[in-house]
């Protein structure tokens, strides 16, 4: 415990909040190019093959981002838009790819929560 005098000489420093999405640089979305598209397994107790992509952003960052929805058309050199938002059971995945923008197609036959998956309204 510091004395009053020590606190006068050197006041307490506030704890700086750590940025959860550093690659975004305070932007809502960022554009990037897929360098690798692959599947990975979630941590315990979940089990699946989650689709993820390694993306090189326009600002030079290289990040791992999640591809939401069922089925996708992404491959190497696809141009994608990413947003912040982690995937709780995939360590190191802090970004999501936005479906229905640039080279990413929307989810086929999606009827509910369509806007989140870039799906057009069914006829």
Curated annotation (Swiss-Prot):
GO terms for cellular component: small ribosomal subunit. Disulfide bonds: none annotated. PROSITE patterns: RIBOSOMAL_S12. The keyword Ribonucleoprotein applies. Residues 110-123 have a biased composition (Basic residues). The keyword rRNA-binding applies. Pfam families: Ribosom_S12_S23 (PF00164). InterPro entries: NA-bd_OB-fold, Ribosomal_uS12, Ribosomal_uS12_bac. GO terms for biological process: translation. Residues 101-123 are annotated as: Disordered. Keywords: Methylation, Ribonucleoprotein, Ribosomal protein, RNA-binding, rRNA-binding, tRNA-binding. It comes from the Bacteria. The modification 3-methylthioaspartic acid is found at residue 89. GO terms for molecular function: rRNA binding; structural constituent of ribosome; tRNA binding. Part of the 30S ribosomal subunit. Contacts proteins S8 and S17. May interact with IF1 in the 30S initiation complex. With S4 and S5 plays an important role in translational accuracy. Interacts with and stabilizes bases of the 16S rRNA that are involved in tRNA selection in the A site and with the mRNA backbone. Located at the interface of the 30S and 50S subunits, it traverses the body of the 30S subunit contacting proteins on the other side and probably holding the rRNA structure together. The combined cluster of proteins S8, S12 and S17 appears to hold together the shoulder and platform of the 30S subunit. PANTHER family: 30S RIBOSOMAL PROTEIN S12 FAMILY MEMBER. Belongs to the universal ribosomal protein uS12 family. This is Small ribosomal subunit protein uS12.
